[in-house]
């Protein structure tokens, strides 16, 4: 039977800083216990009779599946509202939607664009609200990544070094920066200066680092940024629906920051692991991949297929851990 941290009962999870470092570590411990119980088929059902709304203004594979399976494993039911199946923000205000869903559900997950929407849902729902991803933050991904790091390193989190390569202005860059700062880790943001996190986010991370002992580096130099890293992470550079001119500019800026075997060798760590929140453009198996190939002659973008398919890659452990860590959040806040 898992040890459920009662201090998180009824709490929202809108960004990483909603929890203290101790609470974050407690969720990782709970996730590891729940994962072991699932493997052994000895799970205790903490969420019987609970109902959870999944509001998706941005579609997803991993986030939706992780919430649905995590809830089902624990005896809870989910209702999926896709971009066409909800009136939120279109025919009904976010505030009114929150009050309706809060009367019917025990918890609400939201995945969409602005952080302000999930914050407004939380302000008015009267039940725990979870951020499945916004443009600014991706907190459930950080729990999964931290659990994956603990599984693939013998070091405590405070001794683990990781480098994030790519466009660091949005959710993944922000989340990697503040999560590492919160947990006292060695965090490197490796990107063109134009694509660094906003200065206000950097200042928050630096303030956290004073208390946690974290080491924070922002650099344009790939070799400097990855030297000695235990983990190298990246994210997609382009999204469907963006103007092709934006793709062209970003690909031009980020070409030197693609994760290749040379980048992994530059860590000087034979055991370095590769992280990616997925989906990844590592081959020509996607429409975007083929379009980029036709336009730029590239067979991959942010990571080469050689790295993605190598023994260094732990991306599918990371994807699985979305479910275990989301389950921990649901149990801790709703049990």
UniProtKB/Swiss-Prot annotation:
Pathway: Amino-acid biosynthesis; L-arginine biosynthesis; L-arginine from L-ornithine and carbamoyl phosphate: step 1/3. GO terms for biological process: arginine biosynthetic process via ornithine; citrulline biosynthetic process; L-arginine biosynthetic process. Its EC number is 2.1.3.3. Pfam families: OTCace, OTCace_N. One of its GO terms (molecular function) is amino acid binding. Keywords: Amino-acid biosynthesis, Arginine biosynthesis, Cytoplasm, Transferase. Carbamoyl phosphate binds at residues 60-63, 87, 111, 138-141, 277-278, 322. The keyword Cytoplasm applies. GO terms for cellular component: cytoplasm. InterPro entries: Asp/Orn_carbamoyltranf_P-bd (IPR006132), Asp/Orn_carbamoylTrfase (IPR006130), Asp/Orn_carbamoylTrfase_sf (IPR036901), Asp_carbamoyltransf_Asp/Orn-bd (IPR006131), Orn/put_carbamltrans (IPR002292), OTCase_ArgI (IPR024904). It is found in: Cytoplasm. Its main location: cytoplasm. L-ornithine binds at residues 171, 235, 239-240. PROSITE patterns: CARBAMOYLTRANSFERASE (PS00097). It catalyses: carbamoyl phosphate + L-ornithine = L-citrulline + phosphate + H(+). Belongs to the aspartate/ornithine carbamoyltransferase superfamily. OTCase family. HAMAP family: OTCase. Reversibly catalyzes the transfer of the carbamoyl group from carbamoyl phosphate (CP) to the N(epsilon) atom of ornithine (ORN) to produce L-citrulline. This is Ornithine carbamoyltransferase. It comes from Streptomyces avermitilis (strain ATCC 31267 / DSM 46492 / JCM 5070 / NBRC 14893 / NCIMB 12804 / NRRL 8165 / MA-4680). The lineage of its organism: Bacteria, Bacillati, Actinomycetota, Actinomycetes, Kitasatosporales. The gene is argF.
